[in-house]
């Protein structure tokens, strides 16, 4: 009986280690129309911290107050093996632009991008020598990931079965 209990506990712990822990996203309004979401514990060293600049708040003061966008309620954060991930749902025809200097593509949806400094080498392989963890969506919002770490971005490169915008399945 005692051995069976130990096996069950070990099995449950293994399942917990394999399943990513959902992380609560703490939303805070920074300026009118600008929201900051924090997942987990931010590191001391960050892009905005190193830049040491403050935004020109006069322009923001002219913007109207807006509530937290509905999209924020659909964003899911998780932390597993010391890695933080965000899942931001996209609309069916939504396009993404940005992530730094890219020589061969403007539209980034459907790509896997490795955001760390690298030699371009004449290939559009997701690497760049000028990475920027910021993108703008054709739906009218922008996302900045305030991290100085290497990032891998799956920019709409997959589809979830539970998505309300699941694409039509194709036999390939």
Regions found by a protein language model. Give the residues of each.
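Catalytic and substrate-binding clefts that recognize carbohydrates or anionic sugar/phosphate headgroups
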Residues: 24-172
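Bacterial N-terminal signal peptides
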Residues: 10-17
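Sec/Tat signal peptide C-region and signal peptidase I cleavage site
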Residues: 19-23
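Positively charged n-region of N-terminal signal peptides that target proteins for export
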Residues: 1-7
């Amino acid at each position: 009986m005692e051995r069976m209990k130990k096996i069950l506990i070990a099995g449950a712990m293994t399942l917990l280690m394999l399943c990513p822990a959902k992380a609560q996203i703490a939303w805070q309004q920074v300026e009118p129309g600008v929201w900051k979401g924090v997942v987990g514990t931010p590191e001391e060293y960050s892009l905005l911290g190193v830049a040491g600049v403050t935004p020109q708040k006069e322009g923001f003061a002219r913007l109207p107050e807006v509530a937290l966008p509905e999209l924020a309620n659909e964003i899911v954060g998780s932390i597993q093996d010391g890695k933080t991930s965000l899942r931001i749902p996209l609309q069916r025809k939504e396009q993404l632009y940005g992530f730094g200097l890219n020589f061969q593509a403007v539209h980034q949806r459907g790509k896997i991008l490795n955001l760390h400094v690298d030699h371009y080498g004449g290939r559009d392989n997701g690497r760049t020598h000028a990475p920027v963890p910021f993108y703008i969506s054709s739906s009218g919002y922008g996302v900045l990931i305030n991290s100085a770490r290497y990032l891998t971005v799956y920019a709409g490169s997959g589809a979830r079965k539970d998505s309300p915008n699941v694409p039509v399945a194709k036999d390939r």
